[in-house]
């Protein structure tokens, strides 16, 4: 569907339209060429033209879709997180410190975790593991003896013993008791090894959370100890002489806290539990406030599911101030504050760039009239003329537009009935459909801008909208858009100095009707259509999916056997250039076949046998067989996505 001409448009208009000046700060802006620029170090300077960068990466045989990871942004996020807590600690005269950890589950990619460990050493920044495999990752990469290694998740004897033995490697693991039956395993493992880990307990808070992850707290939460279970755990540790090793209280109220009031309530409850644990004789020392530090996906700065009604500094201030208010009146030393802020750290540093392969839309063009058109087709032509000639007040026009659309639908049904009975040919049916959509387009163009619109008429814009076919798999690269209706910023990375004249949604490569993007960042509310530009046959149309660095890669799947995309790690160089630190090649067709236990060699051999049989039957020449097998071998080495 066309929305407007392209005159009188500026990059400021595009920034406002796509919310770039809200969610993009301080890393993404629009430059004078109408391209998105990336400032990986934020306000400290240095920028890269994203379109030029993609062009140069494609010149290095890194095809689209392409995942671009800016390691400078990862480091900058760490710096901002620690700076916020340092300011809060100074403002509230907090005598403790902040010591964060990165939850490995957010992004287990080796280069990502390595980068965080290296950048985080100056703050003794640690890692959080939620499984045995993640524990092994953390043990191999985390070499700072002062950094915390928080051990969460379900734990068997092997998990616990591995964590205990890690202390002898100079690590500082904290085994967090999340289920009552883990207490006895820790006691037995400690006796067997003659050593104990630092121990933590996770409390189930009664404070209610909101949003998509509200069930993370409360009596029915998946993890954590109820208050009676917490007291029983303390007594069991005391009986086993392990109470001196109880050092940490942990809670978690959701992956994306959208309302700061929820955090304040939880902090007050957890702060009092911490005080009571010290009164019961536990030395304590650490309070882990879990994850939940959200990011503003849609830039609205509200308590919506895709936003937050607080800033990073607000978050740090409330954590520091509330914990101090709980501890100081009770003469309890304030703890070292720990957070597992994976989403806030990792989301910004990674973006996916993909190209558009083509588009389609319903035809609203007006067919030429013929002398022997059926009555239903003539009725549709008359209805279109009526719509085009409407005048009067907005209220009166709206009533007449609804009446006209009702007429158009009736005439379309009459035409379909005539076709089914054999009274109408295919050309006349095509004319009836085109005229129906021409009526819809004329109505959509005339709907009042500032007036409540009947739902049926409001839906016409979506029905008329086009579909842009994107070279990606939603299930692989942005699974949360399908699974939980997560909003991500989706923006063309070029032509932003031109008015977008098309409304469309995005369909991916999979043979699945769910494989589409049809919820986009709007002005306060999600919108179903995205403003896009006309496609140019001579130049690729590039779109970016932003803020996708947390969870998306690891949760992506092999639906339709679309594999991982190419990925590249970029760092700014002095003088405004960049360097490529790592290239991670995406899956080939052979890779995904092997993942499903199809041996590419066996596959080729079967096809070779089939080709020989075709030669013997005279269906295939020898040179054609060779060309076919060469083509198949080449396909196995190629990416699972479409190429130029």
Curated annotation (Swiss-Prot):
Catalytic activity, EC: 4.1.1.19
Residue positions where N6-(pyridoxal phosphate)lysine is found in the record: 105
Residues at which substrate binds: 287-297
GO-annotated biological processes: arginine catabolic process; spermidine biosynthetic process
Keyword Lyase included in the entry's annotation: yes
MF term (GO), any: metal ion binding
Annotated Gene3D superfamilies: 1.10.287.3440, 1.20.58.930, Alanine racemase, Lyase, Ornithine Decarboxylase, Chain A, domain 1
Cofactor(s) the protein needs: Mg(2+); pyridoxal 5'-phosphate
Reactions performed catalytically: L-arginine + H(+) = agmatine + CO2
Keywords: Decarboxylase, Lyase, Magnesium, Metal-binding, Polyamine biosynthesis, Pyridoxal phosphate, Spermidine biosynthesis
Name of one Pfam family that matches: Arg_decarbox_C
Keyword Lyase: yes
EC category name: lyase
PANTHER family xrefs: ARGININE DECARBOXYLASE, BIOSYNTHETIC ARGININE DECARBOXYLASE
NCBIfam families assigned: PRK05354.1, speA
Protein role: Catalyzes the biosynthesis of agmatine from arginine.
Family classification: Belongs to the Orn/Lys/Arg decarboxylase class-II family. SpeA subfamily.
Protein name, entry field: Biosynthetic arginine decarboxylase
Native species: Parasynechococcus marenigrum (strain WH8102)
């Amino acid at each position: 569907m066309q929305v407007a001409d392209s005159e009188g448009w500026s990059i400021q208009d595009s920034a406002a339209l796509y919310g770039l000046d809200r969610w993009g700060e301080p890393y993404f802006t629009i430059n004078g060429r109408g391209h998105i620029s990336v400032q990986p170090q934020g306000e400290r300077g240095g920028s890269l033209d994203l379109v030029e960068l993609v062009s140069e990466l494609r010149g290095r045989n890194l095809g689209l879709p392409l995942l671009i990871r800016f390691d400078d942004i990862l480091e900058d996020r760490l710096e901002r997180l620690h700076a916020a807590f340092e300011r809060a600690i100074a403002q509230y005269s907090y005598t403790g410190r902040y010591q964060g950890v990165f939850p490995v589950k957010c992004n287990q990619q080796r280069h990502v975790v390595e980068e965080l460990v290296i950048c985080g050493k100056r703050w003794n920044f640690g890692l959080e593991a939620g499984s045995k495999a993640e524990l092994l990752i953390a043990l191999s990469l985390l070499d700072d003896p002062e950094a915390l290694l928080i051990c969460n998740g379900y734990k068997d004897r092997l998990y616990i013993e591995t964590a205990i033995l890690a202390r002898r490697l100079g690590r500082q693991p904290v085994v967090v008791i999340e289920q009552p039956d883990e207490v006895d395993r820790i006691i037995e493992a400690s006796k067997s090894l003659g050593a104990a880990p630092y121990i933590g307990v996770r409390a189930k808070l009664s404070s209610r959370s909101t949003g998509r992850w509200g069930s993370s707290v409360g009596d029915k939460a998946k993890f954590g100890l109820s208050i009676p279970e917490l007291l029983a755990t303390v007594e069991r540790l005391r009986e086993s002489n392990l109470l001196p090793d109880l050092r940490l209280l942990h809670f978690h109220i959701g992956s994306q806290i959208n309302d700061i009031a929820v955090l304040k309530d939880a902090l007050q409850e957890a702060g009092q539990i911490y005080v009571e644990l010290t009164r019961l004789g536990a030395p304590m020392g650490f309070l882990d406030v879990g994850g939940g530090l959200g990011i503003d996906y849609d830039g609205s700065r509200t308590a919506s599911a895709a936003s937050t009604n607080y800033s990073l500094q607000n978050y740090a201030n409330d954590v520091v101030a509330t914990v101090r208010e709980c501890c100081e009146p009770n003469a309890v030393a304030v703890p070292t504050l720990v957070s597992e802020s994976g989403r806030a750290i990792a989301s910004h540093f990674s973006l996916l760039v993909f190209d558009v392969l083509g588009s389609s839309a319903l035809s609203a063009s007006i067919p030429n009239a013929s002398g022997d058109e059926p009555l239903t087709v003539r009725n549709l032509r008359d209805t279109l003329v009526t719509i085009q000639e409407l005048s009067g007040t907005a209220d009166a026009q709206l009533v007449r537009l609804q009446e006209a659309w009702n007429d158009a639908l009736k005439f379309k049904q009459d035409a379909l009935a005539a076709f089914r009975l054999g009274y109408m040919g295919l050309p006349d049916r095509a004319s009836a459909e085109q005229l129906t959509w021409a009526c819809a387009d004329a109505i959509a163009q005339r709907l009042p801008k500032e007036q409540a619109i009947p739902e049926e008429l409001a839906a016409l814009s979506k029905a008329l909208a086009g579909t842009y076919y994107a070279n990606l798999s939603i299930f692989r690269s942005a699974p949360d858009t399908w699974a939980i209706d997560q909003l991500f910023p989706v923006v063309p990375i070029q032509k932003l100095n031109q008015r977008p004249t098309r409304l469309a949604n995005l369909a991916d490569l999979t043979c699945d009707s769910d494989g589409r993007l049809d919820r986009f960042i709007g002005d306060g509310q999600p919108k179903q259509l995205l403003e896009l530009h006309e496609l140019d046959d001579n130049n690729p149309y590039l779109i970016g999916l932003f803020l996708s660095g947390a969870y998306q890669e690891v949760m992506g799947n092999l639906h339709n056997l679309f594999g991982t995309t190419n990925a590249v790690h970029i760092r700014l160089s002095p003088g405004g250039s960049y360097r490529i630190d790592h290239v991670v090649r995406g899956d080939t067709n052979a890779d995904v076949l092997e993942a499903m236990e199809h041996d590419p060699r066996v596959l080729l051999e079967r096809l070779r046998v089939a080709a020989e049989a075709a030669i013997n039957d005279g269906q295939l020449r020898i040179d054609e067989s060779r060309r076919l097998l060469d083509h198949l071998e080449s396909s196995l080495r190629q990416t699972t996505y479409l190429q130029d």
